């Protein structure tokens, strides 16, 4: 991802921005394929495990961060039920992305 030495470097990093868009697009894909997350994310699981060597705990961490950001952004609309649904979705995605590691 290049220079990640400071918050400013990260915020201005086009590769980070592009990856963020991919992550959010993948969440949309997850919503469309909630009953088949393992298969939907099989290729990404393999990529992150075998090629990128990403610690699978990072998938859980990112999911939790996304839920926090959504709750902050949507405040009143982010009811306990909405929060539970998002937590279930990001946990399912994290599990699917971690599948290749098992």
UniProtKB/Swiss-Prot annotation:
**Annotated residues for binding of heme b:** 19, 48
Which organism is this protein's natural source?
Mesocricetus auratus
- Which one of the record's GO molecular function terms can you name? hemoglobin alpha binding
What keywords would UniProt list here? Heme, Iron, Metal-binding, Oxygen transport, Transport
Assembly, in brief, is:
Heterotetramer of two alpha chains and two beta chains.
The reply on keyword Transport is yes
The GO biological-process annotations, alphabetized, read as: hydrogen peroxide catabolic process
Family annotation (Pfam families): Globin
Q: State the protein's purpose.
A: This is an embryonic beta chain.
Q: Which PROSITE patterns match?
A: GLOBIN (PS01033)
User: What lineage does the source organism belong to?
Assistant: Eukaryota, Metazoa, Chordata, Craniata, Vertebrata
Domain Globin positions: 1-102
Supply the name of the protein: Hemoglobin subunit beta-Z
Top-level lineage group: Eukaryota
Q: Which gene encodes it?
A: HBBZ
Any one cellular-component term (Gene Ontology): blood microparticle
As for family, the record states: Belongs to the globin family.
Show the InterPro entries listed in the entry: Globin (IPR000971), Globin-like_sf (IPR009050), Globin/Proto (IPR012292), Hemoglobin_b (IPR002337), Hemoglobin_oxygen_transport (IPR050056)
């Amino acid at each position: 991802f290049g220079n990640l030495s400071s918050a400013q470097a990260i915020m201005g990093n086009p590769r980070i921005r592009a990856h963020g868009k991919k992550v959010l697009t993948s969440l949309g894909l997850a919503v469309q394929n909630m009953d088949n997350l393992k298969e939907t994310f099989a290729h990404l699981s393999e990529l992150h495990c075998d090629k990128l060597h990403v610690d699978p705990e990072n998938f859980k961490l990112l999911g939790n961060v996304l839920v926090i950001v959504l709750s902050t952004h949507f405040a009143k609309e982010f009811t306990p039920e909405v929060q539970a649904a998002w937590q279930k979705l990001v946990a399912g995605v994290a599990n699917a992305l971690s599948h290749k590691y098992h």
